[in-house]
């Protein structure tokens, strides 16, 4: 790994939707480094056309843990429509036997459940497979 790439990394990012897909992340966030699958307890995956999550006692939100640079974060902010469509925060994630805080995005406006497109679902399933997330 190049030393300049290590210096550019500054944020742990938890992806649970399209950004679990390694092909998409390599285009969107070229400095990103995939660490592995991770989870957030007492939350679950929901859909409002695209992936979102909600608090749900006893559930587990599965996702991919990445290291991203500040440039990657700015790119994600634009892509996720931050702060109008998605907001971002830090939550505790479980990564193996370790617990750490990671950034993630959540939709600002809470709408009713709506099914994602078949293309979105395909990319999401591929991302879960690439990220070794068991569904």
Predicted regions and their residues:
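Glycine-aromatic micro-motifs
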Residues: 2-135
């Amino acid at each position: 790994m190049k030393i300049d790439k290590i210096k550019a990394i500054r944020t742990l990012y938890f992806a649970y939707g399209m950004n679990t897909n390694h092909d998409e992340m390599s285009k969107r966030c070229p400095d990103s480094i995939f660490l592995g699958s991770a989870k957030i307890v007492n939350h679950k995956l929901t859909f409002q056309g695209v992936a979102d999550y909600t608090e749900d006692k006893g559930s587990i939100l599965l996702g991919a843990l990445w290291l991203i640079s500040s440039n990657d974060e700015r790119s994600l902010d634009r892509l996720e429509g931050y702060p109008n469509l998605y907001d971002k925060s830090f939550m505790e994630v479980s990564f193996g036997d370790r617990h750490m805080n990671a950034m993630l995005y959540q939709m600002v406006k809470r709408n009713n459940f709506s099914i994602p497109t078949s293309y979105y679902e395909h990319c999401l399933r591929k991302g879960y497979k690439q990220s070794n997330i068991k569904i």
